[in-house]
Amino acid sequence: MNMTKTAMLIALMTVMFMSIGYLLGGGGGMMIALVIAVAMNLFGYWNSDKMVLRMYNAQEVDERSAPEYYRMVSGLAANAGLPMPKVYIIHEDQPNAFATGRNPENAAVAATTGLLNWLSPEEVAGVMAHELAHVQNRDTLTMTIVATLAGAISMLGNFAFFLGGNRENGNGVMGVVGTLLAMIVAPFGAMIVQMAVSRTREYAADKRGAEICGNPLWLSSALGKIARGAKVIPNEEAEHNPATAHMFIINPLSGRGADNLFSTHPDTDNRIAALEQMAAETGIRSAAMTARAAAPSQNSGPWGQRSDNAGGNSNGGSRYRGPWS
């Protein structure tokens, strides 16, 4: 079923790309857009994961460079019956994480230094279990290809003003209307597809992630902390590349402009409530978890300690001492 949904979403994005090509260049523009879309789909299948990781300057780690983090992911992957994914760290203050890759055999998970430093080990386990659930559900191929195509569609819409109107239909009113439609429809169309990709998949990944890590409240507590952090700590790379926002466990965009108009993620409170209900049904007490999850905000556990001069954003002087340094 996931493969069918993937094919439908890729087809929808291709039709959107071709439609914009027609608005900008008539039949010729549509055919050029089709060729570009096919090439991008093929390229995205093989390389979109590498592009996203490179975009965020993700650093691959192993058991020697980040022992606790790597072993945690290894144990969770074993719990899920998955091959060991590649493990990455993103030097970014905002707590967040994502998974990518075309299949479980070629998957990667990435967490920010903000996530590893500010969350307890239990909460980190909940987050990484959620990302492995995306891998197991084969959501990662869809998310990475959609991120690539959505970015291209949005860019094409931005270029519409400079490319001019539909020359095949004349440079008059229709050309102007076509250009304006491309400029307006393209970014919103990309956002709508992102919403369709992310919202239902996040609930499924939350449920499966809770099963993988063994405690739904680890993940629910983590979601609350990440959501609060994302509101006050900007992720500049994500702000510059909003087409990748749906890949993260929590929307990394700060809400500037129209970011909150069409959210790429379901409401965090609803996700937390669903996880708490799952915990109650399995007999896990939230009070005991609260005491563990609300451990010191400056975590000095297996991820290392935050230095005294920390506090800037990822472009500033916030530095961490940990196994990835």
From Swiss-Prot:
Signal peptide interval: none
Composition bias type Low complexity, residue spans: 306-325
Cellular location(s): Cell inner membrane
Classification via InterPro entries: HtpX_protease (IPR050083), Pept_M48_protease_HtpX (IPR022919), Peptidase_M48 (IPR001915)
Cofactor: Zn(2+)
GO CC, alphabetical: plasma membrane
Gene3D superfamilies with a match to the protein in the record: Metalloproteases ('zincins'), catalytic domain
Keyword Lipid biosynthesis found: no
Family per similarity comment: Belongs to the peptidase M48B family.
Protein name (database record): Protease HtpX homolog
Species whose genome carries this gene: Brucella melitensis biotype 2 (strain ATCC 23457)
